[in-house]
Every structure is written in C-alpha cells, then in structure tokens.
Amino acid sequence: MPMKIVRLICCGIDVHKNLLVATIGITNPSTLETEYVQESFNTLNPELLRLVSWLNLYNCKDVCMESTGKYWIPVWNVLEDHGISVCLTHPKYVKAIKNSKTDKKDSMWICDLFKYDMPKCSFIPPKEIRELREITRYYRKLVGMASSEANRYQNCLTVSNLGIGSIFSDVFGKSSQNVMYYVLAAESLDELTEDDLSELVHKKCKNKDKLLDAIKGSTIQSDAQFKLKEISSHKKELDQHLEACLLEMYRRIQPLSHQFIHITEMSGISLISAIIIISEIGVDMTVWNDGRQL
C-alpha cells in the first residue's frame, strides 16, 4: 500500500553554519508526481529574507529542518516571523542513506520524508517562552559559577588555616567580609586583639568570641591573598548579574503568572523554580501526550 502524501507543497532544509540548502517538493494532486526546486542560501539576514521570498514564490508554507547545533535558531526565527510553519526534527529522524550524502541529496531527502509526514517534530515553545528559557538557563549558569567561586574561596581559607567558615554561616556575608578585608590588609595576624575584630562583626554573631582563635596565627600566602581578593570581587559581580537576571525573569513572567502561579503551591517549588520549569515546558500542556513524554 503506497504511503499517503500529506503535504503537496513542502520544503526540506539542510542546515549548516554558513550554508542552507533548501528543496521544495511540489506534488501534482492528480498524478502524485513530485517536482523539486532547489536553492542555496548563506546564513546572513538578507539571505534568510531571500529564503522567505523564495518559499512564498512557490506558495510553500511548510518547512522541515534538522536541529543542527544552534544554527537552526536564526532560520526558525525569521521563518516564524513571516508566518511559515516549521517542523524542527532530530537528525536521527531524517538520516539519509550512507555513502550517498550530499547537501542537495540531504535536503531532498528531508523534503520527501516531510511530504509523507514521517519526521517527528520537536517541541518548540512560543517565542516568549523561548526567550524566557534563554534567560533562565543563563541564570542557572551564573548560579553554578557563583557556587564554584564560593568553593574556591572556602578552599583558600582552609589552606591558609583561617577558620572563618566555622564562625560564619556565610563567608560572603557582611560580617565575614568585613573581617576578611581587615585580615588581608593587616601586616601580621599575630598581634590581633578581640577589640580589633569586635567592631567588624554584627553584635548578634553567636561565635564572635571564637573569632580571634580562628584567625590568630594563620599564614596567608601571597597567592592565597590574591585569589581571595579576586574571588570576592568576582562573586560580587556575579551577584549583581544574578539580581539583574531575576528582575528580568520576573518582568517576563508577569503576563503568564495566572497560568502557572498554582505550581508554587506544590511543596518544595519556589517562584524561581516555577519560572524555570515553565521556561522549559511552556504553559500549554496539550502539546504533551502524557506525563512520561513531559
């Protein structure tokens, strides 16, 4: 039994870093014979707009392409903005026959498969969700960087036998940093007194009576001094970027807040966690067949 042609006019695009090879398949509804038109484009904006014009010339509104690295994203954005439906599929679903691969053949192969509706289209959320996702992923990267810097800072304290981490729960807190600024500027730690440190620490600090013992007699080598100063400066900068990301995430999620705010009622899910979840799966659950696919 012959396969049913689902799309009489469709396009397959083979995506590369600097090159797009597109094939439009035009099928005669009477004879079911398909004619092909091919064209190559570079990936600069004027050429992407020429791709749109070329597709419109043949009244082609359906396009299929591989999810090749990040190279598909500019193509997707331009086609989406011009009302063209795009199916992004994993390369394994449109893999061509070995030893018979060229860009033109790959493009035609994608077109043929798409004509019969064979490729499985990947879930691509709406534009506003995709933009939010880029920010949340960047935020998570920054969180990881800040965590790594905190670990490096603590390692420097350990190597220098500075027991700051045992006194303060947060070595980047105000009291801890006040003490560290003083310690790093001091010529010698052997002559430190409790009076020198008491003014630097919050009066509610529980372990400030042990602070002098945690510091006195420690030896901070020049390399550790340099690292402690640089890490502290970098951590402050990262905190500023994290705050900026949070503000941007809150701003972008406002129009969608009524659709996802109930997620925060679940135990263990904060507002930030809810935003990150929505940025990955969107707010429309009908696109998922079941919970397992989700």
What annotation goes with each model-predicted range?
Residues 1-294:
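A detector of single, family-specific signature residues
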